[in-house]
């Protein structure tokens, strides 16, 4: 179990051990510090000389324009593979008053437990490691032959025993693709079962331009998971679909506005909304009385998202997005709720649910 009740209250398991939930402070709820996105990379079209150069070269300034419109063209761009750079970059967040990061790189995407611990020691940040499995194309081969119960056991093992001595403290990001395949549903069901038994938050990757949120919540509820401890990630692209987002929040889910600062066209999916649209959507949710269901982050997962390579980095929300929210009418107390209170309450959700939540999973599948 990674959220524990002791004499001082609820604690959250970080890569360096448990910390009181009250010490999470300003928290980014969906980030990547180390990853390997090799399976997202695609080669350049035949005859595209510039594309071939970009695909096989280290990221550099003259590539940025094209990579904003095709970020997976560069093999180098899709991996965060330098711990020293990660320390340098996330230290900017710490210097602005940041305290905690939910690092939701799952197994199969280059999760690096020992490196996360090194980053935590170097920066003083609370880093909470994720677990589980992402989109089907990234699932390790051994997962494909497993049952729901078997996958749930694997997830629970990362939470209770750890990986190389480092325990996960959150489940996710669990991958759901536009096709929402049977394998992805299997893993989601397993994640919900593991959540019910370990009582930790669950973070689900949604394809932001497709409306799978309700189906995801239905699966979680069927397996005994707690919707109030579930984050639906990548809600920025549906920010103008207010009926959809209100319905998800009303069911109790957290809405992950975790694409702040992105300026990318994902060719197979869509264009990331700009920060002005993100801020307007969040301000509307706040006025609708749903600000307590919103979580913020930047989902840094490409080299070009790092400051070193011309991106906005991990401190973007504190440096630029919070002032933008204030211009949209939110107060400092409101943005504190988004960045401090809501992440804390996510980890308190099981305690708050009390006897209302009981696991009713089917362990025979």
What function would you assign to each model-found segment?
Residues 30, 101, 133, 195, ...:
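Divalent metal-coordination and catalytic microenvironments
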Residues 114-117, 142, 181-186, 209-224, ...:
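Distinct, well-ordered alpha-helical segments
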Residues 3-18, 22, 316-365:
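Mid-to-C-terminal alpha-helical segments outside catalytic/metal-binding sites
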Residues 32-81, 131-149, 299-307, 311-322:
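Active-site gating loops and adjacent loop-to-helix segments of metal-dependent hydrolytic enzymes
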Residues 37-39, 113, 212-218, 241-248, ...:
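Histidine/acidic-residue-rich catalytic or RNA/ligand-binding cores of hydrolases
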Residues 29, 43-105, 109-123, 150-166:
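Alpha-helical scaffold segments that flank or form the walls of functional sites
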Residues 100, 118-122, 126-201, 254, ...:
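Active-site gating/metal-coordination segments in enzymes
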Residues 203, 257-259, 290-311, 335:
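Short acidic/histidine-rich active-site segments
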């Amino acid at each position: 179990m990674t959220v524990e009740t002791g004499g001082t209250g609820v604690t959250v398991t970080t890569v360096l051990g448990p910390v009181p939930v009250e010490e999470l402070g300003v928290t980014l709820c969906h980030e990547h510090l180390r990853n390997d996105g090799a399976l997202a990379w695609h080669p350049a079209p035949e005859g595209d000389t510039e594309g071939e150069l970009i695909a096989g070269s280290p990221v550099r300034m003259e590539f940025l324009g094209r990579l904003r419109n095709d970020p997976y063209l560069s093999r180098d761009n899709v991996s965060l593979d330098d711990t020293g750079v990660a320390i340098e970059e996330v230290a900017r967040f710490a210097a602005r008053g940041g305290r905690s990061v939910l690092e939701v790189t799952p197994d199969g995407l280059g999760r690096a437990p020992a490196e996360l611990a090194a980053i935590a020691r170097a920066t003083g940040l609370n880093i909470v490691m994720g677990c589980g499995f992402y989109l089907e194309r990234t699932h390790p081969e051994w997962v494909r032959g497993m049952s729901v119960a078997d996958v749930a056991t694997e997830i629970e093992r990362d939470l209770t025993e750890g990986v190389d001595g480092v325990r996960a403290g959150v489940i996710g990001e669990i991958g759901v693709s536009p096709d929402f395949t049977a394998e992805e549903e299997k893993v989601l069901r397993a994640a919900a079962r593991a959540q019910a038994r370990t009582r930790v938050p669950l973070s689900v990757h949604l394809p932001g331009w497709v409306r799978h949120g309700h189906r995801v919540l239905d699966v979680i509820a069927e397996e005994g998971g707690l919707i109030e401890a579930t984050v639906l990630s990548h809600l920025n692209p549906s920010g103008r679909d207010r009926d959809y987002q209100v319905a998800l929040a009303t069911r109790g889910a957290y809405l992950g506005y975790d694409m702040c600062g992105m300026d990318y066209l994902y060719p197979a999916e869509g264009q990331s909304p700009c920060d002005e649209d993100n801020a307007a959507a969040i301000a509307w949710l706040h006025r609708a009385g749903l600000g307590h269901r919103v979580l913020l982050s930047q989902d840094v997962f490409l080299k070009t998202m790092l400051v070193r390579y011309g991106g906005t980095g991990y401190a973007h929300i504190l440096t630029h997005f919070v002032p933008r929210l204030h211009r949209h009418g939110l107060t400092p107390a409101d943005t504190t709720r988004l960045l401090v209170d809501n992440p804390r309450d996510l980890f308190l959700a099981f305690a708050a649910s009390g006897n209302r939540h009981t696991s009713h999973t089917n362990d025979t599948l």
